Regions:
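Gly/Ser/Thr-rich active-site cleft segment
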Residues: 12-14, 121-207
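Gly/Ser-rich phosphate-binding catalytic loop and adjacent alpha/beta segment
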Residues: 105-108, 115, 131
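Surface "functional belts" at beta-alpha junctions
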Residues: 98
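Short, charged, surface-exposed secondary-structure boundary motifs
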Residues: 43-46, 107-111, 180-182
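N-terminal glycine/serine-rich phosphate-binding loop of ATP-dependent small-molecule kinases
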Residues: 1-95, 123, 149, 194, ...
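Carbohydrate-associated surface elements
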Residues: 102
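Hydrophobic or amphipathic alpha-helical targeting/insertion segments
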Residues: 89-93, 111, 115-116, 120
Length: 207
């Protein structure tokens, strides 16, 4: 008798999310959407945020549906890049993450490049310059109470993975969207972070 592996895939996009049940018997892969839900920014006080608590509730609902349909042996979760969450010393969420379309990073390049040149940042990180990149989001927040309290920095998908597993880590592909991952050293560029006045001790292992 063929052994069937049942896997759950959580796919979050900017406008919707879904949970897929995948059944693999060694010859065939069957996919079934077991849960779909809307996603989008929440506007609060002229800013746009992700409602990560509701999204996590939807993820759990979808995983329960998948688990009721078949015993799960593994799960995977993905979202967009650049956005992140900050946790305090007790691993409590410090506010809902900013949405990448929020205007709080408008004009950030001029301020950041006054401290570290565009050429140096590119030489260290090698990715496209966008004001939504995590480096610039964190830069505009650098004097905020949220950053002062922060003890952990997790990309959005890794926040959900932490809540599901209890393990803190930032997945490699998402870490490269921060613009403070340095491929030359295969890790966070702590010297770049220091030059920009950003914390350099709140980032978990890259996996």
């Amino acid at each position: 008798m063929k052994q069937t592996h049942n896997l759950a895939a959580v796919d979050l996009g900017a406008s919707s999310g879904r949970v897929i049940l995948a059944r693999l018997d060694g010859e065939h892969l069957r996919l079934e959407e077991v849960h779909r839900f809307p996603n989008g920014p929440v506007r609060v006080a002229d800013h746009m945020h992700w409602d990560v608590l509701r999204l996590f509730d939807e993820i759990k609902t979808g995983l329960c549906k998948a688990g009721q349909a078949a015993p799960l042996s593994s799960l995977g979760l993905d979202t967009w890049g650049v956005d992140f969450a900050l946790l305090d010393r007790d691993d409590q969420l410090i506010g809902n993450p900013f949405h990448y379309r929020d205007p709080h990073t408008n004009g950030v390049f001029e301020k950041a490049f006054a401290l570290v040149s565009r050429d140096e940042i590119f030489e260290r990180t090698g990715i496209q310059f966008m004001q939504i990149n995590s480096l610039f989001q964190l830069f505009v927040m650098r004097e905020s109470a949220a950053v002062e309290r922060a003890r952990s920095f997790l990309m959005v998908p890794d926040l959900f993975n932490f809540w599901l597993t209890g393990r803190k880590a930032n997945e490699y592909c998402n870490a490269t969207t921060t613009q403070f991952y340095n491929p030359r050293i295969d890790g966070y560029d702590r010297e770049l972070l220091a030059k920009l006045g950003l914390p350099n001790d709140i980032y978990p292992q890259i996996v």
